[in-house]
Amino acid sequence: MVRKSHADETGQRAPDMPYVFFPIARHRLTSGRAAALLVFGLALGTARAEVGELVLGVAPLLSETETRAQFQPLCDYLAAVARLPCRVGTRPNFITYWETVRQGKDFNLILDEAHFTDYRAQKMKFTVLAKIPNTVTYSLIIPRAAKLSDPARLAGRRIATLGIPSMGAAQLNGLFTKPSKQPILLEVDNAAAGFALLRDDKVAAAILPTPLVREEIMRGAPFRVLLSTAPLPHMGFSSAPDIGPELRQRLRQALLDAHKSDAGRAMLARIGLERFDPANATVYAGQGRILKEYWGY
């Protein structure tokens, strides 16, 4: 288990239901017709009362402000499909996000990393609808000028990572398996904070999602990649059990067909994706085991 410190220890090196209304008839209804209308009304009311709004939860890889700005176009697109309001929800860091995940109340749609997607599918009966295409890795990065080629030499030194139980923290644990040769995990709230610590020489390295690392380096950041982890299924989009089958299928199809419509393509461009791919729980099966292996969840 990687030893842990906190981002403020900078000098230490150590280790909602709608009613359905019918106009009052001017003539008497037969009992059969009245019953039919009643059944229809109840069914419609039930269908519409599954959820009062969509709340799209997103893992806190970015800051709360950045996450809401980045994914509101996706929320707006789904709101139009569902004819329900939609808002983006996230948390300031992974430890508070994890508490929200385990309670299972705040988000009824979620775009999340592989291990959390599997956890929800297995433990909370969420349904996987789609995923971001391809796979994703994490990259261990160091300053460009650092004369370091062996990750083992980072033992005893500070490495910035997204907080426990993020995938980044799990990947860092997997890199350093010897109890006597551990780095010091320095938890950060989001990727930008990790980049800042590395740029200011407050950590020797950082392990962060490779797509974000690539963007940062392309913007001129003085970093280089020491290694990248084995690929994982990219982030999955899943729905909570209170999203009924009909709405769930509409949302799934809207995601998978987004690249075929003007509105969908505009949304994808704004969130930086080409498309969503089909996915189900099998894609993520077994990924949640790291939550138990490393942290006992």
Segment roles from a protein language model:
Residues A34-A43:
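Bacterial N-terminal signal peptides
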Residues E50-F116:
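Extracytoplasmic small-molecule ligand-binding "clamshell" domains
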Residues G52-L61, T67, N134-I142, M218-H259, ...:
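Periplasmic-binding protein-like
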Residues V88-T100, I184-A196, P231-P233:
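Short helix-initiation/N-cap motifs at beta->coil->alpha
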Residues R91, T96-R153:
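Acidic, polar ligand-binding/catalytic clefts
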Residues T100-Q103, L154, L197-R199, L251:
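Hydrophobic residues within well-ordered alpha-helices
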Residues L111-K123, R199-F223, P231:
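A ligand-binding cleft/hinge motif common to bilobed small-molecule-binding domains
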